[in-house]
Swiss-Prot record:
A cellular component annotation (GO) from this entry: membrane
Function: Lipid-binding oleosin involved in tapetum development, especially for the physiology of tapetosomes. Also implicated in the formation of pollen coat.
Organs and tissues of expression: Inflorescence-specific expression, especially in buds and flowers florets. Present in pollen (at protein level).
Protein name: Tapetal oleosin GRP-16
Length: 244
């Protein structure tokens, strides 16, 4: 007699089950959405404040920085050692300009010590004109120790220690060096003497007692005490004079 209530009760069961299913599905959706929002917000915070990632990031930074510094220091030390080695063995390193105020090649002594054509250490006009050998008088090409065209220790054009036509050992007009102890090439024991004001054995700047390669007291290429082709101690064409 109450059997007609069974379909009514089943209807309510289906309605209640459907409503419960919808409510549970809504709750599931809310939970899913909240999980997505929570994950989106928590992921950066986890990366920033993670007890694992934060120390790992710091350690990685220090390791990379230390490795870079070590490599840079190693390369610098190797380059410095190589530079010092090259400098030690005398190889000048490239791209190393001289410091400011350092002397140049033009400032070094002896770089411009002589005029054009002179030998090192000679100045034009001191001991010889440009191109002359040291100690030669004007009239380039003469050997040192000789006056212009004359033998060493004599006046211009005269023999050693004597004027043209005069006795060996006497200057023209009785200049100093006449008697014993006279000019080069005169009597024994004669001091090397030339023209007035001359250095020992020749004109100013000449070497004493003759040019290079000449015998002492002789004219150019001559024997001691005589001119080329003349008798010893005599004037041109004259007889041998006795010692005074």
């Amino acid at each position: 007699m109450l059997s007609f209530l069974i379909p009514v009760v089943q209807f309510f069961q289906v309605v209640i089950a459907a409503v419960a299913s919808v409510v549970f599905l809504v709750f599931a959706g809310i939970t899913f959405g909240a999980s997505i929002v929570g994950l989106t917000i928590a992921t950066p915070l986890f990366v920033i404040f993670s007890p694992i990632l934060v120390p790992a990031t710091i350690a990685t930074t220090f390791l990379v920085g230390g490795a870079t510094a070590a490599v840079a220091l190693g390369v610098t030390a190797f380059a410095l050692i190589l530079w010092l080695f090259k400098h030690r063995i005398g190889v000048k390193p490239k791209n190393n300009p001289a410091p400011k105020g350092a002397p140049t090649k033009a400032d070094q002594p002896g770089a411009s010590g002589g005029a054009s054509g002179d030998k090192p250490g000679e100045m034009s006009g001191a001991g010889g004109p440009s191109g002359d050998k040291p100690g030669g008088a004007s009239g380039g090409g003469d050997k040192p120790g000789g006056a212009s065209g004359g033998g060493p220790g004599g006046a211009s054009g005269g023999a050693s220690g004597g004027a043209s036509g005069g006795a060996s050992g006497g200057a023209s007009g009785g200049a100093s060096g006449g008697g014993p102890g006279g000019a080069s090439g005169g009597g024994p024991g004669g001091a090397s003497g030339g023209g007035p004001g001359g250095a020992s054995g020749g004109a100013s700047g000449d070497k004493p007692e003759g040019a290079p390669g000449d015998k002492p007291g002789g004219a150019w290429g001559g024997k001691p005490g005589k001119k080329p082709g003349h008798k010893p101690e005599g004037a041109r064409g004259g007889k041998r004079l006795a010692w005074w």
